[in-house]
Amino acid sequence: DLRMSRGLGDVYKRQIGSNRILLNYITGVLPELDVYGIRQMTMEQLFIRLLYEDWDERKYRFHLLEKDDEKNAQKGNREWFHDLELYCAAYEQREISHEEVYLENTKTLLVGHVLINTYLREHPDLSMQSKILMLNEVLYSKYENEVLGKQISYPAKVKKALDKKYASFFGDGKWKTSIYDFYREFLQVQAVAGKEVDIPETSFDVYDLAALAYIYKRIKETDPVREASHVVIDEAQDFGMMAYCCLHYCLRGCTYTIMGDTSQNIHFRYGLNDWEELRKLVLTGTYDAFGLLRKSYRNTVEISKFANDILRHGDFAVYPVEPIIRHGAAVRVEKQPDATALLEETVHTIRKWQQDGYETIAVICREEKEAAELAEQLKSYMEIVDCNPGTTEFGDGVMVLSVVYTKGLEFDAVLLYDPTQKKYPADNGHVKLLYVAATRALHELVVLYHGNLSRILTDPVSKEKKQKVFASETLTKAKEYEKKTFTQKEIEQQRRTEADKERNARSYIGPERIEVSAPKEEEPDLSLIHISEPTRHAQISY
């Protein structure tokens, strides 16, 4: 596993996971760690929250992006985010006027090209609507200073019209376009550029939601809300850079702890297969750190060896893992003559585990449909935990899950159900799926099947084949520093510096400071000046 920390603070506000089952599992562990007050949500739910009033749960819903959807998978990469950035920047350039503004009926320049561009350049973090409001305030203050300072008078109706004109010259601050229509227009532009994806109407995947949250924050928002001071992301490899770029923009000023394992990236086409891009995005501070959690405390030596043999079938690099020495039962791989025998042996194996005292048991299938059908069959023989991904609470008992929903979980015993060649062809994506399934087991792992077993599990790996390993030199150590003490004089100087910064910042959004000059001293009456010899000192009497 990997742990990536950015500015670790005292307050944890958000825990982000890939699905509700994982979050419910984490929630059960947190009280044991004496950690309270943490809000947990999936990445989809977080982006929905960032849409605020623009999300209508009666009208819209979200769905999971299909794993084999190559066309829509391109929405998860960083290039897609870059395209969205450029599209929003071009839109802002068109919407915000850059023309010089003169006081009506005069040649007095109120705001010029240079000033407008300076304000826009110096406030890149503001949304388009916030920039419009800022420019309106700057222009109106210039207008008021000009009119009041030079005592220019207008008829009441003219003055009222001018006030209205300059108060909303750059726009009224209310964006009338729907973020959904704006997003669909962006997707149409992408299609023309040869990057066609499905255009959603009322159902959105995580990358649609990420884009919508970015558009809201980048274009529409006028009243920013600080959602969190620290965010913890688990199973980070499941999300592509598009999600992280949008999250980084929407939660600016937030610190992060990001954890994951690229060997368990089951979304091979759009998840993270290495950490380089994410490191460059978030690890920018002096005391940010990137490190490895090498020790694996979950699996027995036998299960760990079986899982690592699966991993060696891939041609991708991995981070080396050091399992602790804990031996257990050998992994059992057993073929059944037909589907009926497969079901009977599944029931027999589960009952034996229950007799042995195992409290958490998982039967792992390839797809959700297969898991649901098998769960219905097993209910005739034993009690099965409800495994609805949206509502399930992790707990004791027998769970029948698709491999996708087992990520991040661990069970006393795991039965890998019918992993045939058809379900798990020999490619990198399915290598990672089988690796995830195998590493869920704490004590016992059994593989039951009928038909042709996946070649990932049958084909031997050449002893000459070397597993690609990421270089350890890429790690960074968290920096240590001593707390610096300041003298009272240094503290006062810092306060004066901060006050100057605040005063300069306020000049952007309010009237300029009025410089008040000290009154000139009156010339003294020369009759009251007496020059005395020989010193010739001037003595002035008042």
Language-model features and meaning:
Residues 2-12, 529-542:
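Single conserved hydrophobic/aromatic residue that forms the stacking wall/gate
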Residues 93, 316, 537-540:
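Charged, solvent-exposed alpha-helical segments that act as regulatory interaction surfaces
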Residues 15, 334, 359-361, 520-529:
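Intrinsically disordered low-complexity regions specifically enriched for long asparagine
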Residues 9, 20-28, 32-36, 41-46, ...:
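Conserved helicase motor core of SF1/SF2 NTP-dependent helicases
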Residues 10-232, 237-246, 254, 273, ...:
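Alpha-helical nucleic-acid-binding subdomain
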Residues 479-528, 532:
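Intrinsically disordered, low-complexity N-terminal extensions of nucleic-acid-metabolism proteins
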